[in-house]
């Protein structure tokens, strides 16, 4: 018997208990970083989500698109600014974010998933009042002073009705991280934050964050210090001590939101690894860092 065929059979056998465990369960996937840019990685993620759907899981996708927003902003003469990993969003930048995230990125993901035979539906947080937003009041971690980030929002509430209706009917929701505030004002919300809030509201079994890092490191400058498992208490301690920087702050804050909302496990995995989503969900070893209560 060909060894390659035997290896494939072993992989399928290893996946069986995970398929059984997660069939019928909701898994929220935050899709961002390099996995959105490279064609081969993008194709792998779409295949992974399709397989999850075909084996009976209920995936919900929340996507980013920051690099594309920055690129269009620069083309329009606006230099992107960030504070503690959050994009400063004036009225012009808000309009650009909507154009890119809702009008372009969301459509592309839906198209790719539909090409895999998945019934995907594109949404933003504005649709059916899915994500109610409140203006984010931010205190700089560097200076301790309040900083006006413009139309940057926090998730005030998630209306799960539309998501439950779609997933029950066999659709895969694909959500752009734009929320709606009082008077219909749109707000730019960090995609990690949205993913954490939706995972909590939907009582998801898992939240998986696809990122451009291997996971969480004990020493951010030492690749060999990757942590396979961390607790919510450790994360809270790191945030309080100012140990975290940049985009890792909202990522780990969203992990806490999800866990406190009833999600069992959160995984931060390297989206630069082809099929990392399948490796995390359907293999014994998994990849990246698992955050638990």
UniProtKB/Swiss-Prot annotation:
Its BP terms in the Gene Ontology are: arginine biosynthetic process via ornithine; L-arginine biosynthetic process
**GO CC field:** cytoplasm
Q: Which InterPro entries match?
A: AceGlu_kinase-like_sf, AcgluKinase_fam, ArgB, Asp/Glu/Uridylate_kinase, Glu/AcGlu_kinase, NAGK-C
Q: Where does substrate bind?
A: 65-66, 87, 188
Catalytic activity reads: N-acetyl-L-glutamate + ATP = N-acetyl-L-glutamyl 5-phosphate + ADP
Give the enzyme's main class according to its UniProt record, as a single word: transferase
Alphabetized GO MF terms: acetylglutamate kinase activity; ATP binding
Q: Does the keyword Kinase apply?
A: yes
Subcellular location, record wording: Cytoplasm
> Pathway, according to UniProt?
Amino-acid biosynthesis; L-arginine biosynthesis; N(2)-acetyl-L-ornithine from L-glutamate: step 2/4
Task: Identify the EC number(s).
Answer: 2.7.2.8
Keyword Transmembrane helix set for record: no
Location of site Transition state stabilizer?
Answer: 30, 251
- A Pfam family of the record is AA_kinase
Question: What keywords appear on the UniProt entry?
Answer: Amino-acid biosynthesis, Arginine biosynthesis, ATP-binding, Cytoplasm, Kinase, Nucleotide-binding, Transferase
Q: Report the main location listed first in the record.
A: cytoplasm
What does this chain do? Catalyzes the ATP-dependent phosphorylation of N-acetyl-L-glutamate.
- State the similarity comment: Belongs to the acetylglutamate kinase family. ArgB subfamily.
- Name of the protein described by the UniProt record: Acetylglutamate kinase
């Amino acid at each position: 018997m060909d060894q390659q065929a035997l290896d494939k059979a072993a992989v399928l056998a290893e996946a069986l208990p995970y398929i059984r465990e997660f069939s019928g369960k909701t898994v929220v996937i935050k899709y961002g970083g390099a996995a959105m840019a490279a064609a081969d990685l993008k194709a792998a993620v779409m295949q992974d989500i399709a397989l999850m759907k075909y084996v009976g899981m209920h995936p919900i996708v929340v996507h980013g698109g920051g690099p594309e927003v920055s690129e269009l902003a620069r083309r329009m003469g606006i230099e992107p600014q960030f504070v503690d990993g959050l994009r400063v969003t004036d009225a012009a930048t808000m309009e650009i974010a909507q154009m890119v995230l809702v009008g372009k990125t969301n459509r592309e993901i839906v198209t790719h998933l539909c090409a895999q035979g998945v019934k995907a539906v594109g949404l933003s947080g504005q649709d059916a009042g899915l994500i109610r937003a409140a203006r984010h009041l931010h205190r700089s971690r560097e200076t301790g002073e309040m900083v006006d980030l413009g139309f940057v929002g926090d998730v005030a509430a998630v209306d799960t009705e539309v998501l439950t209706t779609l997933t029950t009917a066999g659709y895969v929701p694909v959500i752009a991280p734009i929320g709606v505030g009082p008077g219909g004002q749109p707000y730019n919300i960090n995609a990690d934050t949205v993913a954490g809030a939706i995972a909590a509201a939907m009582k998801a079994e898992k939240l998986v964050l696809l990122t451009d890092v291997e996971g969480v490191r004990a020493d951010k400058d030492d690749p060999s210090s990757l942590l396979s498992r961390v607790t919510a208490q450790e994360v809270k301690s790191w945030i309080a001590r100012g140990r975290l920087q940049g985009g890792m702050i909202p990522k780990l804050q969203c992990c806490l939101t999800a866990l406190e909302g009833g999600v069992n496990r959160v995984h931060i995995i390297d989206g630069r690894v082809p099929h990392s989503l399948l490796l995390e969900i359907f293999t014994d070893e998994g990849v990246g860092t698992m955050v638990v209560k």
